[in-house]
């Protein structure tokens, strides 16, 4: 099949180079967006009388028919068409004849593909935002039932201070909220129309860029035709936002993987979200969080690929930009599938071992800060209190004891301000309850946080 640009050349493309150059194998994913873009363009050409009303209607009807045939499985774009744009144009010409050749008046593939990608990304971002919200709701539902369930908090993967499990889960909701906000910000910059910028310099054809932008739901148009076709920063922003969101999913995954080990035993996997071993019959493997953790690197790789793609590319459009599509397509699919999988895992795949969680905070030194705070409440300088408690920890470790095993006389050997009420302060429930600074893990603060998210998530 002859290329639309073939009259300029004396010889045909080398067959391998033809396949190497083609993008139809992956940009056919943009078929519906390309059809919508072309329909809006054809309407505009009719409105501005570049085409007659009859020609505009004929083209629009032809494009609508192609859409129907595609949705019914009767039209499948592919080689020898070079890309989705030519594939549709060739199909249109075969349906309506010479009038179909007028569709491309006043535009270039450069602004056309930029428009298609933005339309596609806009839809994907909207889907991802919904998926993030669904995951937030899943965490919320578990959190509201576990305000008084305690869990060890860690720094440097060492026991630090006890926490409300609800507070721990609400931390994930906060992270996911920032992810949602980033996607909203990306969407705002995606939602700008390049259509009408043509190849790079605009066009002498009488067009109405504001009309096509409005038809396609864009907020505004690019003000500079060169810029409109010269950058893929919006693609990079999308993958960057996705990479950050995946980093949060990976963090959550890592914690779940640890929690379900025999060593931690803070939770267990249900049969719905675990697999077995081909050799070891006792195994129950956390494949879902492991896969999410692994797929995070995949999105990081796409981000690096796009950053490298645009590095040092001069104005304006360059063929390098053909390499933008597979990274964003795969990124969208990856983050969407991981969000769905994590939501199912949280809803159906994990059960917390409340007894083990409770036992774990009863048998460690994570209340050491509270012992120091007790002395601070007795007007002892914090640094002095800190050093005193350090000595007590060392004393207990040598004797394989915990604070709760000491007698008041032993406490007083380290500082005279210790009294019987110290034992109440050291109980894990009271330790957590006392952390009532704004945003803290104290039960009153956690309830406030839950009320905030109940309204925010419209629950």
Swiss-Prot record:
One of its GO terms (molecular function) is argininosuccinate lyase activity. Pfam families: ASL_C2 (PF14698), Lyase_1 (PF00206). It is found in: Cytoplasm. GO terms for cellular component: cytosol. GO terms for biological process: arginine biosynthetic process via ornithine; L-arginine biosynthetic process. The keyword Ribonucleoprotein does not apply. InterPro entries: Arg_succ_lyase_C, Argininosuccinate_lyase, Fumarase/histidase_N, Fumarate_lyase_CS, Fumarate_lyase_fam, Fumarate_lyase_N, L-Aspartase-like. Keywords: Amino-acid biosynthesis, Arginine biosynthesis, Cytoplasm, Lyase. It catalyses: 2-(N(omega)-L-arginino)succinate = fumarate + L-arginine. Pathway: Amino-acid biosynthesis; L-arginine biosynthesis; L-arginine from L-ornithine and carbamoyl phosphate: step 3/3. Its EC number is 4.3.2.1. PANTHER family: ARGININOSUCCINATE LYASE. NCBIfam families: argH. HAMAP family: Arg_succ_lyase (MF_00006). Belongs to the lyase 1 family. Argininosuccinate lyase subfamily. This is Argininosuccinate lyase.
